[in-house]
Regions:
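Acetyl-CoA-dependent GNAT
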Residues: 3, 7-72, 78, 141
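Alpha-helical interaction/dimerization surfaces of two-component signaling modules
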Residues: 19-23, 102, 125, 129
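Residues at alpha-helix boundaries and the short loops/turns that link adjacent helices
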Residues: 22-26, 89, 132
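Residue-level recognition of the GNAT/N-acetyltransferase active site
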Residues: 65, 83, 87, 116
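Conserved active-site alpha-helix within GNAT-family acetyltransferase domains
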Residues: 93, 105, 117-135, 140
Length: 142
């Protein structure tokens, strides 16, 4: 499968919404362009897609952040998903590689990804890419 990784466009909204739904985050396609624009305006965030034969088969978002505890920036993959029909073909690895390249280019010294406890297959994938389980995360909905 020949795959191109490129920046997400507003015209990718339907495909991105569908992929987010596969990940367990039902999304209205009409919201995607608005969210992409907000992310572009804020800066430090990139959403890209994997395209094969004119079809979007994966997407990922990475953000860069600076904290008081470190001089160097760190990156965080906030979304990565490949269509069920296109998994195990190197697309997820290509998306993660693009996130790593972006983070290196802007001076990050680390990249993290958060994954729900029940996504064991995803955890194995991240370990194969060289990621290590590091800490627990706590969230309070506001």
């Amino acid at each position: 499968m020949d795959v191109t990784i490129r920046e997400a466009r507003d015209s990718d909204a339907e495909a991105i919404a569908s992929l987010l739904g596969e990940l367990g985050y039902p999304t209205d396609a009409a919201a995607v362009p608005r969210r992409l624009e907000r992310m572009r305006a804020e800066g430090g965030q990139w959403t890209f897609v994997a395209e094969s034969d004119g079809q979007v088969v994966g997407t990922a978002t990475v953000m860069v952040r600076h904290t008081i505890s470190r001089d160097a920036a760190s990156g965080r993959v906030t979304t990565v998903v490949v269509s069920e029909t296109a998994r195990s073909q190197g697309i997820g690895s290509a998306l993660m590689e693009r996130a790593e390249v972006i983070c290196r280019e802007v001076g990050c010294t680390a990249l993290e990804v958060t994954s729900a406890e029940h996504r064991r297959r995803a955890h194995d994938f991240y370990v194969r890419l060289g990621y290590e389980e590091h800490r627990k995360r706590f969230i309070k909905l506001l």
